[in-house]
């Protein structure tokens, strides 16, 4: 069974220590609920990932663990076969002892767009909401973050993260918790909170913004990336049914509308730092994610539209600061 004891130990003397009043019970219940299904099989695979301390680690320009020279060809093939059990790999890429995990998303491209605009992460306590397999968490660590906590309710994403961490070394202060943000108490403790690719999946986007705000210390920074459409502060797309074949997309605001939502949620210093149309090179099917991808979600005769006729995915990154005092948004 995946253990969270090292996380409890790391936060016991940190700004997150009051979380220990509730977190062990929540995660204990999660473990009891997931004794069956795919998780036990994945945990057996994790227990086979015994490799030497990597001779090189790079989290600053990539997520590279090991040069590939420490393993024989046979050992590298075995590692690749074990990691393949966790398909589909959606966020990456990773290079692990010479095994190149070419994920569906070029998440490094997103990081390169965002990183120049955020406050330096050195010595900061960071929360990544909807962290997926944890690619960006490793890049946050590479920027010098003191603690990085990622939350995502997916057991598969947790096991993908655990696979990478066990090979990299468990001593790194980066942790995955299989939780949704609605399961977090208002911690008021993180220096930086990231929410990337989550807001449009929330039925109540304002509630999500308030949940993000409540995790930040006063003066802390929110980095919000989400799907947007063109328009003024009153423009919001509500898909009638599906958007890009996804049935869990609820609200796509314009940048101006999104900034207004943030202001109403008691954020200040709100600024849009990037708007980018998702390209077919950034999101595509690969050997490590062989299912449908962006090209299958777009109109084959007009890639500026989804198959449903909506504007094709365009993503904006907004940075904002938690205001003082923390008043409840009505």
Curated annotation (Swiss-Prot):
Carboxy-S-adenosyl-L-methionine binds at residues 91, 105, 110, 130, 152-154, 181-182, 196, 200, 315. This is tRNA U34 carboxymethyltransferase. It catalyses: carboxy-S-adenosyl-L-methionine + 5-hydroxyuridine(34) in tRNA = 5-carboxymethoxyuridine(34) in tRNA + S-adenosyl-L-homocysteine + H(+). Catalyzes carboxymethyl transfer from carboxy-S-adenosyl-L-methionine (Cx-SAM) to 5-hydroxyuridine (ho5U) to form 5-carboxymethoxyuridine (cmo5U) at position 34 in tRNAs. The keyword Lyase does not apply. It comes from Shewanella piezotolerans (strain WP3 / JCM 13877). Pfam families: Methyltransf_9 (PF08003). Belongs to the class I-like SAM-binding methyltransferase superfamily. CmoB family. Homotetramer. Keywords: Transferase, tRNA processing. InterPro entries: CmoB, Mo5U34_MeTrfas-like, SAM-dependent_MTases_sf. GO terms for molecular function: methyltransferase activity; transferase activity, transferring alkyl or aryl (other than methyl) groups.
